[in-house]
Curated annotation (Swiss-Prot):
Source species taxonomy: Eukaryota, Metazoa, Chordata, Craniata, Vertebrata
Subcellular localization(s) per the UniProt record: Mitochondrion matrix
Signal peptide residues on this chain, from the entry's feature table: none
Family the entry assigns: Belongs to the complex I LYR family.
Location, primary (coarse class): mitochondrion
GO BP term, example: mitochondrial respiratory chain complex III assembly
Protein name as catalogued: Complex III assembly factor LYRM7
Gene this chain is encoded by: Lyrm7
Organism: Rattus norvegicus
Length: 104
Protein backbone atom coordinates (compact mmCIF):
# COMPACT_ATOMS: atom_id res chain seq x y z
CA UNK A 1 0.00 0.00 0.00
CA UNK A 2 1.40 3.41 -0.96
CA UNK A 3 2.01 6.16 1.56
CA UNK A 4 -0.94 8.34 0.46
CA UNK A 5 -3.26 5.37 1.00
CA UNK A 6 -1.72 4.68 4.42
CA UNK A 7 -2.16 8.32 5.41
CA UNK A 8 -5.82 8.29 4.35
CA UNK A 9 -6.39 4.98 6.15
CA UNK A 10 -4.87 6.39 9.37
CA UNK A 11 -6.98 9.55 9.04
CA UNK A 12 -10.17 7.48 8.76
CA UNK A 13 -9.12 5.14 11.57
CA UNK A 14 -8.44 8.05 13.92
CA UNK A 15 -11.88 9.52 13.20
CA UNK A 16 -13.60 6.14 13.74
CA UNK A 17 -11.75 5.68 17.03
CA UNK A 18 -12.67 9.22 18.07
CA UNK A 19 -16.35 8.45 17.46
CA UNK A 20 -16.20 5.27 19.56
CA UNK A 21 -14.11 6.64 22.42
CA UNK A 22 -15.96 9.93 22.86
CA UNK A 23 -19.45 8.62 22.06
CA UNK A 24 -22.23 10.97 23.33
CA UNK A 25 -19.70 13.67 24.35
CA UNK A 26 -20.21 16.46 21.82
CA UNK A 27 -17.47 18.69 23.18
CA UNK A 28 -14.81 15.96 23.17
CA UNK A 29 -15.93 14.70 19.75
CA UNK A 30 -15.59 18.18 18.26
CA UNK A 31 -12.25 18.89 19.96
CA UNK A 32 -10.79 15.59 18.73
CA UNK A 33 -12.15 16.18 15.20
CA UNK A 34 -10.57 19.63 15.07
CA UNK A 35 -7.22 18.36 16.41
CA UNK A 36 -7.03 15.42 13.97
CA UNK A 37 -7.92 17.61 10.98
CA UNK A 38 -5.52 20.35 12.10
CA UNK A 39 -2.55 17.96 12.43
CA UNK A 40 -3.18 16.36 9.03
CA UNK A 41 -3.59 19.76 7.32
CA UNK A 42 -0.43 21.08 8.98
CA UNK A 43 1.63 18.27 7.41
CA UNK A 44 -0.23 17.79 4.10
CA UNK A 45 2.70 19.12 2.02
CA UNK A 46 5.30 16.82 3.63
CA UNK A 47 7.24 14.90 0.97
CA UNK A 48 10.02 13.17 2.94
CA UNK A 49 9.23 9.42 3.12
CA UNK A 50 11.11 9.10 6.42
CA UNK A 51 9.19 11.96 8.01
CA UNK A 52 5.87 10.61 6.71
CA UNK A 53 6.70 7.16 8.09
CA UNK A 54 7.54 8.71 11.47
CA UNK A 55 4.26 10.67 11.54
CA UNK A 56 2.30 7.53 10.56
CA UNK A 57 3.88 5.73 13.54
CA UNK A 58 2.93 8.60 15.87
CA UNK A 59 -0.64 8.61 14.54
CA UNK A 60 -0.95 4.84 14.98
CA UNK A 61 0.36 5.12 18.54
CA UNK A 62 -2.17 7.86 19.31
CA UNK A 63 -5.00 5.73 17.92
CA UNK A 64 -3.90 2.75 20.03
CA UNK A 65 -3.63 4.94 23.14
CA UNK A 66 -7.13 6.36 22.61
CA UNK A 67 -8.62 2.93 21.99
CA UNK A 68 -6.99 1.19 24.96
CA UNK A 69 -6.56 3.87 27.64
CA UNK A 70 -9.38 6.40 27.48
CA UNK A 71 -12.51 5.86 29.55
CA UNK A 72 -15.46 8.23 29.86
CA UNK A 73 -16.69 9.67 33.12
CA UNK A 74 -20.06 11.36 33.72
CA UNK A 75 -20.63 13.90 36.51
CA UNK A 76 -23.50 12.47 38.55
CA UNK A 77 -23.19 14.70 41.60
CA UNK A 78 -21.17 17.64 42.84
CA UNK A 79 -18.11 15.49 43.52
CA UNK A 80 -19.00 12.15 41.94
CA UNK A 81 -18.04 10.65 38.59
CA UNK A 82 -19.64 7.59 37.05
CA UNK A 83 -17.21 5.71 34.83
CA UNK A 84 -18.60 4.34 31.57
CA UNK A 85 -16.16 1.75 30.19
CA UNK A 86 -16.58 0.51 26.64
CA UNK A 87 -17.19 -3.21 26.22
CA UNK A 88 -13.85 -3.69 24.45
CA UNK A 89 -12.02 -2.37 27.55
CA UNK A 90 -13.63 -4.85 29.93
CA UNK A 91 -11.73 -8.04 30.57
CA UNK A 92 -12.54 -11.17 32.52
CA UNK A 93 -10.99 -11.46 35.94
CA UNK A 94 -7.91 -13.61 35.75
CA UNK A 95 -6.84 -15.46 38.90
CA UNK A 96 -3.63 -14.04 40.31
CA UNK A 97 -1.07 -16.05 42.18
CA UNK A 98 2.03 -14.31 43.47
CA UNK A 99 3.62 -17.58 44.60
CA UNK A 100 6.12 -18.84 42.02
CA UNK A 101 5.29 -22.11 40.35
CA UNK A 102 7.61 -24.95 41.20
CA UNK A 103 9.14 -27.05 38.48
CA UNK A 104 9.73 -30.71 39.19
Amino acid sequence: MGQPAKVLQLFKTLHRTRQQVFKNDKRALEAARVKINEEFKKHKNETSPEKIKEMLKIGSDVELLLRTSVIQGIHTDHDTLQLVPRKDLLTENVPYCDAPTQKL
